[in-house]
């Protein structure tokens, strides 16, 4: 089950479309969907988590806590809406595209993809692009 929680004024326009897409992303990686909680927040909220739990005194767009057991992926994914907005501007993409990238990024970590080395980051970016292309909204 995929849940969206809001600790900021932001909210998704079409939660069901995002839920369907993220479920398809999980299936495409041959994993089973456990409980995945997305928590949308601001920089201050996520910075506190980064310092308290990871001992990193920096701003970030996403922090994920992985509770995956075996093939069933579960966890809490915190997303700073402010960072996503700034990154979208920096990368010259729409807010929605950058948001999709971040949402997929969290799932891909749970599927075992890393991004610390250049090679791993390149594979992660490729997988993000592949998963973003899977998103569609029925018109």
UniProtKB/Swiss-Prot annotation:
GO biological process annotation, one example: rRNA processing
Chief location of this protein within or outside the cell: cytoplasm
Cofactor(s) annotated in UniProt: Zn(2+)
One cellular component term from this protein's GO annotations in UniProt: cytoplasm
Localization (cell): Cytoplasm
Keywords: Cytoplasm, Endonuclease, Hydrolase, Metal-binding, Nuclease, Ribosome biogenesis, rRNA processing, Zinc
Cofactor note: Binds 1 zinc ion.
EC code(s) of this entry: 3.1.-.-
PANTHER family, alphabetized: ENDORIBONUCLEASE YBEY, CHLOROPLASTIC
Protein name: Endoribonuclease YbeY
Source organism per UniProt: Flavobacterium johnsoniae (strain ATCC 17061 / DSM 2064 / JCM 8514 / BCRC 14874 / CCUG 350202 / NBRC 14942 / NCIMB 11054 / UW101) (Cytophaga johnsonae)
